[in-house]
A protein has these predicted regions:
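Basic/polar N-terminal segments that are highly enriched at the extreme N-terminus
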Residues: 1, 18-21
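Sec-dependent signal peptide recognition
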Residues: 2-10
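Hydrophobic h-region of N-terminal signal peptides that target proteins for export
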Residues: 10-19
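Non-catalytic cap/lid and distal C-terminal segments of serine-dependent acyl enzymes
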Residues: 20-187
């Protein structure tokens, strides 16, 4: 019995370690529009390195206020565990991208000084499409987000339906114009 439990524990730990290796944090991206570096995280499909021609759909996972891209893996949903389940069900063949959102609500600021949404659409997505083997069209691009990121997951496709085919806002945070103006800008 102990032998079976040890074998099971070893297999489970091996799978988790394998998925964690694929969750690559602090990838470099420099935005000319924002004049700053915005690190992101990425998870590639298990067979990504086995073939040089296969292209994959992309899911952008947008985090909540006060969080970072790594919080998808460390704090909230334990992404590596979710990925293992998705792959066991045959549903893991996506490129998952976790952008840095600061406290932007994935929108442009009212005064135009921090055009986050414009940067996301005009710089970040083309950067990802150029760096990775994505299927670079709207039918293969989606957003999922929680809290502030849920707002981003909703507003990005609403304002840019030519770019995204699917949106899953989770526990979405809403802000009125007045609330948005009162919040301190942090980036």
């Amino acid at each position: 019995m102990n032998k079976v439990l040890y074998t099971f524990a070893f297999c489970l730990l091996s799978l988790t370690a394998f998925a964690q290796e694929r969750f690559t944090s602090n990838q470099p991206f420099h935005s000319e529009m924002l004049g700053m570096d915005l690190p992101y995280a990425v998870v590639l499909p298990a067979d990504y390195d086995e073939t040089s021609e296969t292209r994959y759909p992309v899911i952008y996972l947008t985090h909540g206020i006060g969080c970072t891209p790594d919080d998808w893996n460390d704090k909230y949903i334990r992404f590596e565990e979710t990925l293992i389940q998705l792959e066991q069900e045959g549903l893991g063949d996506f490129i998952y991208v976790f952008p840095t959102g600061f406290s932007s609500y994935y929108s442009n600021t009212y005064d135009g000084k921090f055009p986050y949404m414009d940067m996301f659409i005009q710089e970040f997505i083309p950067f990802i499409d150029g760096k990775y083997r994505t299927i670079a069209d709207r039918d293969h691009r989606a957003t999922i987000g929680f809290s502030m990121g849920g707002f981003g997951a909703m507003v990005l496709p609403l304002k840019h339906p030519e770019t995204f085919c699917f949106s899953a806002p989770l526990s979405m945070s809403f802000r009125t114009d007045e609330m948005y103006l009162e919040e301190p800008l942090k980036w």
